[in-house]
Amino acid sequence: MDETTERPTVSFSYSNWISNIKKSTREAYEAKPFSHWILLFFSGAAMLIAFPASSLLSRLYFSNGGKSKWIISWVAVAGWPITCLILLPTYIFQKIKPTPLNTKLVLSYVVLGFLSAADNLMYAYAYAYLPASTSSLLASSSLAFSALFGYLIVKNPLNASVINSIVVITGAMAIIALDSSSDRYSYISNSQYFAGFFWDIMGSALHGLIFALSELLFVKLLGRRSFHVALEQQVMVSLTAFAFTTIGMVVSNDFQGMSHEAKSFKGGESLYTQVLVWSAVTFQLGVLGATAVLFLASTVMAGVLNAVRVPITSVAAVILMHDPMSGFKILSLVLTFWGFSSYIYGSSSSNSSTQASSSSS
């Protein structure tokens, strides 16, 4: 009797969840104009193309003779005028005024800019010492850190599915660490490999903290969600991160060293310039696409696209840069997908229960 009553309950719960997803998808499609979905499509495409391209270009910089972590960190935020150029028409044509600055808002931008500069520097160490496919898999742990810091700082719900995703993604990172012997480049020492591993995880943790603090900034200080406000935040944070990274470039004399580095770069000065310019463009387009997806859709949608770009980067790195792809790394990739799926399921379940409670009240 117990078994016969249990199975239909589980089946019903799963099918009910699927039907709710279909219903909410249909309602969302009918509620928005066609232009909304076109913009969302191009924003998602920007994430899925620009972020993997940026990762591969960063790795190409180091594999072809680039040495400076500061240069690749500086390039990551040097494309901030691109977002500024997209923001300006909203002021001109929509007659929208810029958000007034106050002391708390300026301090928030400075703190987030400093953290972003530090985050980019940590990831630069990862790109210097790790294959692009490995650094991409490790960077996916930022989702677990985002969930954890979101719970601690923004008080976002942390249900069993989200906790499961944190545990699974952590296990995937441990598997990569165990496979260091087959994953490490011959010219990279053990200490350099584990330094890249460490800074990739630290960068992912800091990225999760930045995400939570950015969400808190929207909730506490900006007080409203609109696209131009999201663009303003991105411009100001990128600008302050650019300022901090420029100071680092000046102190380390890397501006003077760029000409010498370009001459010794494998492929010549032209390729060196192209790698740096396109790194700046692709990274900023990826960030802009992610900002648009967060505004047009949801955090869950951004998480889905973030999950999809991990295998895209890994497969592209194996094909284009001949990264090693062992059985351990494939297992880690599968576990990462599992963790992402669990997170997405937990987030959608929380959103559904929140909407149900608000509608009933």
UniProtKB/Swiss-Prot annotation:
Please tell me where this protein is predominantly located. membrane
Please state where this protein is localized: Membrane
Tell me the keywords, alphabetical order: Membrane, Transmembrane, Transmembrane helix, Transport
Q: Has UniProt tagged this entry with the keyword Transmembrane helix?
A: yes
Q: How does it sit in the membrane?
A: Multi-pass membrane protein
* Alphabetized GO MF terms: purine nucleobase transmembrane transporter activity; purine nucleoside transmembrane transporter activity
Task: Please identify the protein, giving its name as recorded.
Answer: Probable purine permease 5
- The species this protein belongs to is Arabidopsis thaliana
The upper taxonomy is:
Eukaryota, Viridiplantae, Streptophyta, Embryophyta, Tracheophyta
Q: Which gene encodes it?
A: PUP5
